[in-house]
Amino acid sequence: MAAGSTGERPFFEIITSIRYWVIHFVTLPSIFLAGFLFVSTGLAYDAFGTPRPDAYFQASESKAPVVSQRYEGKSELDVRLK
């Protein structure tokens, strides 16, 4: 081992190894697919508590509500949603 070496394999050697690609050939698409399903099924909205795209506005509204009082904004929106 050379002086100053940490004993780790060089990055180029890792990404050119067959073992790296055998492992990542399965894991990388799996992570992408899991993320796609997490978002497309709506589970992401439930997990993070964000409103779904169709819940931002009520059917009778055509634009975003305007909050007039800075510190009472939440109560204004709560009244609007009732």
From Swiss-Prot:
Positions with a binding annotation for heme: 24
Membrane topology: Single-pass membrane protein
Major location (coarse): membrane
Localization of this protein: Cellular thylakoid membrane
Function: This b-type cytochrome is tightly associated with the reaction center of photosystem II (PSII). PSII is a light-driven water:plastoquinone oxidoreductase that uses light energy to abstract electrons from H(2)O, generating O(2) and a proton gradient subsequently used for ATP formation. It consists of a core antenna complex that captures photons, and an electron transfer chain that converts photonic excitation into a charge separation.
Family: Belongs to the PsbE/PsbF family.
The protein, known as: Cytochrome b559 subunit alpha
Species per Swiss-Prot/TrEMBL record: Parasynechococcus marenigrum (strain WH8102)
